Amino acid sequence: RDIFWNPKKGFRIIQSFIPMLGENEFHIWNQSFSLFLPYSKTVTLALNTTMQKKYGYKNDVWINYFGNSFNIRGWKLPKKGSSLDNFRFGHEFIFSSFEVRKIVLSEKASVLGLSKGLCFVGFIDGGVINKNWDDINMDNLIGGAGIGVRIPVPILQSIRIDIGWGIKNKMFNKNYAVHLAIQQKF
């Protein structure tokens, strides 16, 4: 896999096991599988699936949510009064993302030997989350779709700006959400 700001071909597998020790001990097992396929010289198809399983103590302090720039895009951040029982919250999840990445500006800069570029992206995300793996079902499936831009930045890889619309029950949300992040989603 190309490890720079915009991978063009190859694959990446990430596994992590995170122990949270103490009075209310738990362990998190994360898995991420990514595939990058060159479609043309300037277009890359990128696919990712990420899963999380949590073992041990589960409470609402360490709960995860869908709707940020690193999982299901197109959803606004949850409000403070959001119910933790809703379809966007849980401890265990699986989600997938598909991106079409198109380089629209690519050149080598002579200033400090840094590369410049600009990449436009179309994306579709989808996944399910729940408090327990056994309770995960397709009735809680949510998604997001949209477009974005990637601006390469030395050391940080890239600045990522995405605009998306959430999808639930085969209907798009009326309002869009803007997500700003550093690095590619995967």
What are these regions (language model features)?
Residues 146-152, 160-162:
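Active-site scaffold segments
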